[in-house]
Amino acid sequence: MVYKILIVDDDQEILKLMKTALEMRNYEVATHQNISLPLDITDFQGFDLILLDIMMSNIEGTEICKRIRREISTPIIFVSAKDTEEDIINGLGIGGDDYITKPFSLKQLVAKVEANIKREERNKHAVHVFSEIRRDLGPITFYLEERRVCVNGQTIPLTCREYDILELLSQRTSKVYTREDIYDDVYDEYSNALFRSISEYIYQIRSKFAPYDINPIKTVRGLGYQWHG
């Protein structure tokens, strides 16, 4: 299977370097250099992963992410020279699934891409292994093959990481998961900023269920988080 990757960056040289590095690993790569408003959502559909630069002249990558997140669940890796913990947490909080800071090596870039794609494949494979395609928990329904969550038939626009966290908690509704448990399930590497992002993801999940007067995640003080049906 050939995986399709979209790179969005207004620096032509960086686009060329990233495109070449990924094509050498047999990825099919498309690029966008001059993104501007209004966005055409079809420009971002049909890909297995998106690499999105944050600091661009016409529109920031964070704004692009906010505008397309309700329409696509494709993993998004932010690429940016903004490298503080708060920058990373903010990027993940508005819909990013991972973050790579400039300057970076092409080996690091490829490793990030491969880790995210492998995780998506493992998640899809797990559904088939356990032969569960639907999970009903009160008004909340998981469509596991589609990696989609609905409340009374209405789809909740979760990012890949948000879905992973919520689905993990729903597997064993009586278990309390520590932040370490959740982190180990959704990330393949350690980073303090990524670890801190777990709380932000929990906040974003809750905010997306709030219009339905549902809070699917209970905080167990001093321990962690638990499914709250």
Curated annotation (Swiss-Prot):
4-aspartylphosphate: residues bearing it: D53
DNA-binding region in chain numbering: 132-229
Residue intervals of the Response regulatory domain: 4-117
GO biological process: regulation of DNA-templated transcription
InterPro entries the record matches: CheY-like_superfamily (IPR011006), OmpR/PhoB-type_DNA-bd (IPR001867), Sig_transdc_resp-reg_receiver (IPR001789), WalR-like (IPR039420), WH-like_DNA-bd_sf (IPR036388)
Family annotation (Pfam families): Response_reg, Trans_reg_C
Keyword check for Zinc: no
GO cellular component: cytosol; protein-DNA complex
PROSITE patterns per UniProt: OMPR_PHOB, RESPONSE_REGULATORY
KW Repeat (keyword) present: no
Keywords, in A-Z order: Activator, DNA-binding, Phosphoprotein, Transcription, Transcription regulation, Two-component regulatory system
Domain of life the protein comes from: Bacteria
GO molecular function: phosphorelay response regulator activity; transcription cis-regulatory region binding
Modifications after synthesis and translation: Phosphorylated by NisK.
Function per UniProt: Member of the two-component regulatory system NisK/NisR involved in the regulation of the biosynthesis of lantibiotic nisin. NisR may function as a regulatory protein.
Protein name per the record: Nisin biosynthesis regulatory protein NisR
Organism the protein comes from: Lactococcus lactis subsp. lactis (Streptococcus lactis)
Lineage of the species this protein comes from: Bacteria, Bacillati, Bacillota, Bacilli, Lactobacillales
